[in-house]
Protein backbone atom coordinates (compact mmCIF):
# COMPACT_ATOMS: atom_id res chain seq x y z
CA UNK A 1 0.00 0.00 0.00
CA UNK A 2 1.03 3.62 -0.42
CA UNK A 3 1.68 6.29 2.17
CA UNK A 4 -1.56 8.30 2.54
CA UNK A 5 -1.25 11.48 0.51
CA UNK A 6 -2.97 14.71 1.49
CA UNK A 7 -4.04 16.36 -1.79
CA UNK A 8 -3.88 19.79 -0.16
CA UNK A 9 -0.14 19.32 0.37
CA UNK A 10 0.36 19.34 -3.41
CA UNK A 11 -0.77 22.93 -3.97
CA UNK A 12 1.07 26.24 -4.24
CA UNK A 13 4.81 26.86 -4.35
CA UNK A 14 7.72 26.09 -2.05
CA UNK A 15 11.49 26.51 -1.75
CA UNK A 16 13.88 23.55 -1.70
CA UNK A 17 17.67 23.51 -1.38
CA UNK A 18 20.38 20.98 -2.27
CA UNK A 19 24.14 21.17 -1.81
CA UNK A 20 27.15 19.59 -3.45
CA UNK A 21 30.90 19.51 -2.82
CA UNK A 22 33.84 19.44 -5.22
CA UNK A 23 36.48 16.78 -5.76
CA UNK A 24 38.89 18.41 -3.31
CA UNK A 25 36.51 18.58 -0.37
CA UNK A 26 38.12 16.45 2.39
CA UNK A 27 35.20 14.02 2.63
CA UNK A 28 35.14 13.66 -1.16
CA UNK A 29 38.89 13.02 -1.23
CA UNK A 30 38.21 10.14 1.16
CA UNK A 31 35.40 8.80 -1.02
CA UNK A 32 37.55 8.91 -4.15
CA UNK A 33 40.54 7.25 -2.49
CA UNK A 34 38.32 4.44 -1.18
CA UNK A 35 36.88 3.90 -4.65
CA UNK A 36 40.34 4.07 -6.25
CA UNK A 37 41.37 1.16 -4.03
CA UNK A 38 38.16 -0.70 -4.95
CA UNK A 39 38.83 -0.17 -8.67
CA UNK A 40 42.39 -1.45 -8.32
CA UNK A 41 41.08 -4.63 -6.68
CA UNK A 42 38.37 -5.22 -9.30
CA UNK A 43 40.73 -4.52 -12.21
CA UNK A 44 42.76 -7.62 -11.26
CA UNK A 45 40.15 -9.69 -9.44
CA UNK A 46 36.45 -9.05 -10.23
CA UNK A 47 35.49 -11.25 -7.26
CA UNK A 48 37.29 -9.00 -4.78
CA UNK A 49 35.46 -8.29 -1.54
CA UNK A 50 36.23 -4.74 -0.45
CA UNK A 51 35.23 -2.56 2.48
CA UNK A 52 37.74 0.28 2.35
CA UNK A 53 37.47 3.40 4.50
CA UNK A 54 39.65 6.50 4.26
CA UNK A 55 40.50 9.29 6.69
CA UNK A 56 42.51 12.38 5.80
CA UNK A 57 43.91 15.39 7.62
CA UNK A 58 46.85 17.77 7.13
CA UNK A 59 49.56 15.95 5.16
CA UNK A 60 48.08 12.52 5.88
CA UNK A 61 45.82 9.87 4.38
CA UNK A 62 44.93 6.62 6.10
CA UNK A 63 43.07 3.74 4.48
CA UNK A 64 41.68 0.99 6.65
CA UNK A 65 39.14 -1.79 6.40
CA UNK A 66 38.70 -5.33 5.17
CA UNK A 67 39.75 -6.55 1.72
CA UNK A 68 39.85 -10.08 0.36
CA UNK A 69 41.36 -10.17 -3.13
CA UNK A 70 43.81 -11.97 -5.39
CA UNK A 71 45.02 -8.60 -6.68
CA UNK A 72 48.51 -7.43 -5.81
CA UNK A 73 48.06 -3.84 -4.72
CA UNK A 74 50.57 -1.02 -4.43
CA UNK A 75 48.56 1.05 -1.97
CA UNK A 76 51.03 3.91 -1.98
CA UNK A 77 50.79 4.32 -5.74
CA UNK A 78 47.00 3.91 -5.89
CA UNK A 79 46.34 6.45 -3.16
CA UNK A 80 48.86 9.03 -4.35
CA UNK A 81 47.58 8.82 -7.93
CA UNK A 82 44.02 9.42 -6.71
CA UNK A 83 45.12 12.55 -4.85
CA UNK A 84 47.07 13.68 -7.92
CA UNK A 85 43.99 13.26 -10.11
CA UNK A 86 41.97 15.39 -7.70
CA UNK A 87 44.50 18.19 -8.09
CA UNK A 88 46.45 18.36 -4.84
CA UNK A 89 49.91 18.35 -6.38
CA UNK A 90 51.71 21.14 -4.54
CA UNK A 91 52.23 21.98 -0.88
CA UNK A 92 51.19 25.55 -1.72
CA UNK A 93 47.65 24.15 -2.17
CA UNK A 94 47.76 22.71 1.34
CA UNK A 95 48.18 19.09 0.24
CA UNK A 96 50.60 17.28 -2.06
CA UNK A 97 50.29 13.71 -3.34
CA UNK A 98 54.09 13.46 -3.55
CA UNK A 99 54.82 14.24 0.10
CA UNK A 100 51.70 13.29 2.08
CA UNK A 101 52.01 10.49 4.62
CA UNK A 102 50.08 7.37 3.55
CA UNK A 103 49.05 4.90 6.25
CA UNK A 104 47.51 1.50 5.44
CA UNK A 105 45.62 -0.70 7.92
CA UNK A 106 43.88 -3.32 5.78
CA UNK A 107 42.84 -6.77 6.99
CA UNK A 108 41.03 -9.68 5.35
CA UNK A 109 37.26 -9.87 5.50
CA UNK A 110 35.73 -11.74 8.43
CA UNK A 111 35.22 -15.43 7.57
CA UNK A 112 31.82 -15.22 9.29
CA UNK A 113 30.67 -12.58 6.80
CA UNK A 114 32.17 -14.55 3.90
CA UNK A 115 30.19 -17.59 5.04
CA UNK A 116 26.98 -15.56 4.86
CA UNK A 117 27.70 -14.64 1.26
CA UNK A 118 27.77 -18.31 0.13
CA UNK A 119 30.76 -18.02 -2.21
CA UNK A 120 30.47 -21.66 -3.21
CA UNK A 121 27.10 -21.03 -4.84
CA UNK A 122 26.43 -19.66 -8.30
CA UNK A 123 26.72 -15.89 -8.58
CA UNK A 124 22.94 -15.62 -9.03
CA UNK A 125 22.46 -17.11 -5.57
CA UNK A 126 24.91 -14.76 -3.87
CA UNK A 127 23.43 -13.58 -0.59
CA UNK A 128 23.33 -9.92 0.38
CA UNK A 129 26.51 -8.79 2.15
CA UNK A 130 24.55 -7.22 4.98
CA UNK A 131 21.09 -6.21 6.07
CA UNK A 132 19.83 -2.75 5.21
CA UNK A 133 17.34 -0.47 3.50
CA UNK A 134 18.01 1.32 0.20
CA UNK A 135 16.11 3.99 -1.71
CA UNK A 136 15.92 5.10 -5.32
CA UNK A 137 14.30 8.31 -6.54
CA UNK A 138 13.39 9.81 -9.91
CA UNK A 139 11.54 12.95 -10.96
CA UNK A 140 10.54 14.23 -14.39
CA UNK A 141 11.74 17.80 -13.71
CA UNK A 142 15.00 17.26 -15.68
CA UNK A 143 16.05 15.03 -18.62
CA UNK A 144 18.32 13.12 -16.20
CA UNK A 145 15.28 12.55 -13.95
CA UNK A 146 17.18 14.13 -11.06
CA UNK A 147 16.18 17.09 -8.88
CA UNK A 148 17.25 20.35 -10.51
CA UNK A 149 18.49 21.71 -7.17
CA UNK A 150 21.05 18.92 -6.94
CA UNK A 151 21.90 18.80 -10.63
CA UNK A 152 22.81 22.50 -10.72
CA UNK A 153 24.82 22.22 -7.50
CA UNK A 154 26.80 19.33 -9.03
CA UNK A 155 27.30 21.17 -12.32
CA UNK A 156 28.66 24.26 -10.58
CA UNK A 157 31.34 22.15 -8.88
CA UNK A 158 32.10 20.21 -12.06
CA UNK A 159 32.51 23.43 -14.04
CA UNK A 160 34.81 24.91 -11.42
CA UNK A 161 36.96 21.78 -11.64
CA UNK A 162 37.00 22.10 -15.43
CA UNK A 163 37.99 25.78 -15.26
CA UNK A 164 40.76 24.91 -12.81
CA UNK A 165 42.13 22.17 -15.06
CA UNK A 166 41.92 24.03 -18.37
CA UNK A 167 43.54 27.13 -16.90
CA UNK A 168 40.66 29.55 -17.46
CA UNK A 169 40.49 30.13 -13.69
CA UNK A 170 44.05 29.22 -12.66
CA UNK A 171 43.67 30.55 -9.10
CA UNK A 172 41.03 27.94 -8.24
CA UNK A 173 41.93 25.08 -5.91
CA UNK A 174 40.17 21.68 -5.66
CA UNK A 175 38.09 22.30 -2.51
CA UNK A 176 34.72 23.80 -3.52
CA UNK A 177 31.17 23.82 -2.14
CA UNK A 178 27.89 24.85 -3.74
CA UNK A 179 24.25 25.16 -2.73
CA UNK A 180 21.19 25.94 -4.85
CA UNK A 181 17.72 26.98 -3.68
CA UNK A 182 14.88 26.74 -6.20
CA UNK A 183 11.28 27.86 -6.08
CA UNK A 184 9.03 25.00 -7.15
CA UNK A 185 5.36 24.71 -7.97
CA UNK A 186 3.33 21.62 -7.21
CA UNK A 187 1.79 19.93 -10.22
CA UNK A 188 -0.29 17.24 -8.61
CA UNK A 189 2.34 15.13 -6.91
CA UNK A 190 5.02 16.16 -9.38
CA UNK A 191 7.19 19.25 -8.89
CA UNK A 192 8.06 21.93 -11.44
CA UNK A 193 11.08 24.24 -10.97
CA UNK A 194 10.18 27.87 -11.63
CA UNK A 195 13.28 29.90 -10.74
CA UNK A 196 16.53 29.84 -8.81
CA UNK A 197 16.16 31.88 -5.63
CA UNK A 198 19.64 31.57 -4.11
CA UNK A 199 23.07 30.31 -5.15
CA UNK A 200 25.91 29.74 -2.69
CA UNK A 201 29.47 29.12 -3.90
CA UNK A 202 32.61 28.77 -1.79
CA UNK A 203 35.86 28.04 -3.59
CA UNK A 204 39.37 27.47 -2.32
CA UNK A 205 41.77 29.80 -4.10
CA UNK A 206 45.38 30.92 -4.31
CA UNK A 207 46.63 34.09 -2.64
CA UNK A 208 46.93 36.06 -5.88
CA UNK A 209 43.27 37.00 -6.32
CA UNK A 210 41.10 39.36 -4.30
CA UNK A 211 37.73 38.32 -2.92
CA UNK A 212 36.05 41.00 -5.04
CA UNK A 213 37.64 39.73 -8.25
CA UNK A 214 36.91 36.11 -7.34
CA UNK A 215 33.23 36.90 -6.83
CA UNK A 216 33.03 38.57 -10.22
CA UNK A 217 34.80 35.71 -12.00
CA UNK A 218 32.70 33.00 -10.35
CA UNK A 219 29.47 34.83 -11.17
CA UNK A 220 30.29 35.47 -14.83
CA UNK A 221 32.34 32.39 -15.76
CA UNK A 222 30.74 29.70 -13.60
CA UNK A 223 27.26 30.56 -12.36
CA UNK A 224 25.91 32.33 -15.43
CA UNK A 225 27.34 29.72 -17.79
CA UNK A 226 25.98 26.82 -15.71
CA UNK A 227 22.48 27.88 -14.67
CA UNK A 228 20.10 28.46 -17.61
CA UNK A 229 19.15 32.14 -17.90
CA UNK A 230 15.44 31.31 -17.70
CA UNK A 231 15.89 30.38 -14.04
CA UNK A 232 17.69 33.62 -13.07
CA UNK A 233 16.17 37.05 -12.56
CA UNK A 234 16.89 40.31 -10.71
CA UNK A 235 15.71 38.75 -7.45
CA UNK A 236 18.16 35.84 -7.51
CA UNK A 237 20.53 36.09 -4.55
CA UNK A 238 24.20 35.13 -4.99
CA UNK A 239 26.32 34.34 -1.94
CA UNK A 240 29.75 33.94 -3.51
CA UNK A 241 32.60 33.39 -1.06
CA UNK A 242 30.40 34.60 1.83
CA UNK A 243 33.17 33.94 4.38
CA UNK A 244 35.73 36.00 2.46
CA UNK A 245 39.15 34.37 2.03
CA UNK A 246 39.28 30.61 1.45
CA UNK A 247 43.00 29.92 0.99
CA UNK A 248 43.37 27.09 3.50
CA UNK A 249 41.21 24.21 2.29
CA UNK A 250 41.16 20.50 1.66
CA UNK A 251 42.47 18.24 4.44
CA UNK A 252 44.48 21.14 5.88
CA UNK A 253 41.24 22.97 6.62
CA UNK A 254 39.08 20.05 7.76
CA UNK A 255 39.39 16.33 8.37
CA UNK A 256 37.77 14.08 5.78
CA UNK A 257 36.12 10.67 6.08
CA UNK A 258 34.58 8.22 3.63
CA UNK A 259 30.79 8.19 3.64
CA UNK A 260 30.16 11.66 5.05
CA UNK A 261 28.44 13.02 1.92
CA UNK A 262 25.67 10.50 1.34
CA UNK A 263 23.02 13.11 0.50
CA UNK A 264 25.34 14.82 -1.99
CA UNK A 265 25.97 11.38 -3.50
CA UNK A 266 22.28 10.64 -3.99
CA UNK A 267 19.31 13.02 -4.27
CA UNK A 268 20.22 16.20 -2.41
CA UNK A 269 17.65 15.74 0.33
CA UNK A 270 14.80 14.68 -1.96
CA UNK A 271 13.28 11.22 -1.65
CA UNK A 272 14.85 9.31 1.22
CA UNK A 273 18.12 7.66 2.24
CA UNK A 274 18.71 4.32 3.94
CA UNK A 275 21.84 5.55 5.70
CA UNK A 276 24.45 3.37 4.00
CA UNK A 277 27.33 5.05 2.18
CA UNK A 278 28.58 3.88 -1.22
CA UNK A 279 32.31 4.47 -1.65
CA UNK A 280 34.84 1.76 -0.90
CA UNK A 281 32.24 -1.02 -1.08
CA UNK A 282 32.11 -3.79 -3.69
CA UNK A 283 28.86 -4.98 -5.27
CA UNK A 284 28.14 -7.60 -2.58
CA UNK A 285 27.40 -4.69 -0.25
CA UNK A 286 23.76 -3.95 -1.02
CA UNK A 287 24.17 -0.49 0.53
CA UNK A 288 25.66 0.32 -2.86
CA UNK A 289 24.45 -2.20 -5.43
CA UNK A 290 20.80 -2.21 -4.31
CA UNK A 291 20.76 1.61 -4.11
CA UNK A 292 21.92 1.67 -7.74
CA UNK A 293 19.22 -0.88 -8.54
CA UNK A 294 16.56 1.19 -6.77
CA UNK A 295 17.58 4.24 -8.83
CA UNK A 296 17.41 2.12 -12.01
CA UNK A 297 13.92 0.94 -11.08
CA UNK A 298 12.68 4.44 -10.22
CA UNK A 299 14.11 5.92 -13.41
CA UNK A 300 12.61 3.12 -15.51
CA UNK A 301 9.16 3.69 -14.01
CA UNK A 302 9.27 7.41 -14.80
CA UNK A 303 10.67 6.86 -18.30
CA UNK A 304 7.89 4.37 -19.04
CA UNK A 305 5.32 7.03 -18.17
CA UNK A 306 3.92 4.99 -15.29
CA UNK A 307 4.63 7.80 -12.81
CA UNK A 308 6.03 11.33 -12.98
CA UNK A 309 7.89 11.07 -9.69
CA UNK A 310 8.59 8.10 -7.47
CA UNK A 311 10.49 6.71 -4.52
CA UNK A 312 11.47 3.03 -4.35
CA UNK A 313 12.55 1.24 -1.17
CA UNK A 314 14.24 -2.16 -1.04
CA UNK A 315 15.37 -4.11 2.03
CA UNK A 316 17.74 -7.06 2.43
CA UNK A 317 19.10 -9.48 5.04
CA UNK A 318 22.67 -10.80 5.17
CA UNK A 319 23.04 -14.08 3.32
CA UNK A 320 19.57 -13.83 1.74
CA UNK A 321 19.45 -13.18 -2.01
CA UNK A 322 15.89 -11.96 -2.51
CA UNK A 323 14.82 -8.59 -1.09
CA UNK A 324 12.64 -8.78 2.01
CA UNK A 325 10.37 -5.95 0.90
CA UNK A 326 9.68 -3.59 -1.98
CA UNK A 327 7.85 -0.29 -1.61
CA UNK A 328 6.89 2.38 -4.14
CA UNK A 329 5.64 5.89 -3.40
CA UNK A 330 4.26 7.59 -6.51
CA UNK A 331 3.29 10.89 -4.83
CA UNK A 332 -0.11 10.63 -6.49
CA UNK A 333 1.37 10.80 -10.00
CA UNK A 334 0.61 7.25 -11.13
CA UNK A 335 -0.76 7.05 -14.66
CA UNK A 336 -4.10 5.30 -15.03
CA UNK A 337 -4.49 5.29 -11.26
CA UNK A 338 -2.20 2.32 -10.63
CA UNK A 339 -1.83 1.46 -6.96
CA UNK A 340 1.47 0.99 -5.17
CA UNK A 341 0.80 -2.77 -5.11
CA UNK A 342 0.35 -2.79 -8.89
CA UNK A 343 3.60 -0.87 -9.37
CA UNK A 344 5.40 -3.36 -7.13
CA UNK A 345 4.08 -6.20 -9.30
CA UNK A 346 5.45 -4.45 -12.40
CA UNK A 347 8.82 -4.17 -10.64
CA UNK A 348 8.84 -7.86 -9.70
CA UNK A 349 7.94 -8.79 -13.28
CA UNK A 350 10.77 -6.75 -14.82
CA UNK A 351 13.65 -6.77 -12.33
CA UNK A 352 15.60 -9.61 -10.72
CA UNK A 353 16.71 -7.99 -7.47
CA UNK A 354 19.17 -10.61 -6.26
CA UNK A 355 22.66 -9.11 -5.67
CA UNK A 356 24.32 -11.67 -7.94
CA UNK A 357 22.02 -10.68 -10.80
CA UNK A 358 22.32 -6.95 -10.11
CA UNK A 359 26.09 -7.14 -10.58
CA UNK A 360 25.69 -8.70 -14.03
CA UNK A 361 22.94 -6.42 -15.32
CA UNK A 362 24.61 -3.22 -14.10
CA UNK A 363 28.24 -4.26 -14.83
CA UNK A 364 29.21 -3.74 -11.20
CA UNK A 365 32.25 -6.05 -11.26
CA UNK A 366 34.15 -3.58 -13.44
CA UNK A 367 36.52 -0.88 -12.09
CA UNK A 368 34.11 2.02 -12.64
CA UNK A 369 33.79 3.46 -9.16
CA UNK A 370 36.38 6.25 -8.92
CA UNK A 371 34.30 8.39 -11.26
CA UNK A 372 31.09 7.75 -9.31
CA UNK A 373 32.62 9.49 -6.30
CA UNK A 374 32.75 12.82 -8.19
CA UNK A 375 29.63 15.01 -8.44
CA UNK A 376 27.04 12.40 -7.56
CA UNK A 377 26.49 8.73 -8.35
CA UNK A 378 23.50 9.37 -10.62
CA UNK A 379 24.66 12.28 -12.78
CA UNK A 380 26.80 10.37 -15.30
CA UNK A 381 24.30 9.06 -17.83
CA UNK A 382 26.80 6.51 -19.22
CA UNK A 383 26.46 4.22 -16.22
CA UNK A 384 24.18 1.20 -16.67
CA UNK A 385 21.83 2.16 -13.83
CA UNK A 386 21.17 5.49 -15.56
CA UNK A 387 19.93 3.78 -18.73
CA UNK A 388 16.23 3.02 -18.18
CA UNK A 389 15.02 -0.51 -18.76
CA UNK A 390 12.18 -1.08 -21.23
CA UNK A 391 9.38 -2.51 -19.12
CA UNK A 392 6.95 -5.29 -19.96
CA UNK A 393 3.58 -4.20 -18.61
Curated annotation (Swiss-Prot):
Mg(2+) binds at residue 19. ATP binds at residues 25, 175-177, 243-246, 254, 260-261, 277, 281, 285. Its EC number is 2.5.1.6. It catalyses: L-methionine + ATP + H2O = S-adenosyl-L-methionine + phosphate + diphosphate. L-methionine binds at residues 66, 109, 254, 285. Binds 2 magnesium ions per subunit. The magnesium ions interact primarily with the substrate. InterPro entries: ADOMET_SYNTHASE_CS, S-AdoMet_synt_C, S-AdoMet_synt_central, S-AdoMet_synt_N, S-AdoMet_synthetase, S-AdoMet_synthetase_sfam. GO terms for molecular function: ATP binding; metal ion binding; methionine adenosyltransferase activity. PROSITE patterns: ADOMET_SYNTHASE_1 (PS00376), ADOMET_SYNTHASE_2 (PS00377). Keywords: ATP-binding, Magnesium, Metal-binding, Nucleotide-binding, One-carbon metabolism, Potassium, Transferase. K(+) binds at residue 53. Pathway: Amino-acid biosynthesis; S-adenosyl-L-methionine biosynthesis; S-adenosyl-L-methionine from L-methionine: step 1/1. GO terms for biological process: one-carbon metabolic process; S-adenosylmethionine biosynthetic process. Its cofactor is Mg(2+); K(+). Belongs to the AdoMet synthase family. NCBIfam families: metK. Catalyzes the formation of S-adenosylmethionine from methionine and ATP. The reaction comprises two steps that are both catalyzed by the same enzyme: formation of S-adenosylmethionine (AdoMet) and triphosphate, and subsequent hydrolysis of the triphosphate. This is S-adenosylmethionine synthase. It comes from Ascobolus immersus.
Amino acid sequence: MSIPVNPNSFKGSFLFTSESVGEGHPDKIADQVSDAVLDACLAEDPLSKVACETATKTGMIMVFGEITTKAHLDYQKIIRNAVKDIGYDDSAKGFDYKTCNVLVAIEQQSPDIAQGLHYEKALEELGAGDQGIMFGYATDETPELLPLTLLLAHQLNANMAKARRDGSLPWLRPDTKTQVTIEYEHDGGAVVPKKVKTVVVSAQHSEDITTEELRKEILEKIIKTTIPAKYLDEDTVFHIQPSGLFIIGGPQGDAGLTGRKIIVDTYGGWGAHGGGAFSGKDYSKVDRSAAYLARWIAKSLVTAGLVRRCLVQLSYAIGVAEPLSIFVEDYGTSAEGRTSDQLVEIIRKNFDMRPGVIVQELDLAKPIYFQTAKNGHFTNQEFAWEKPKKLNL
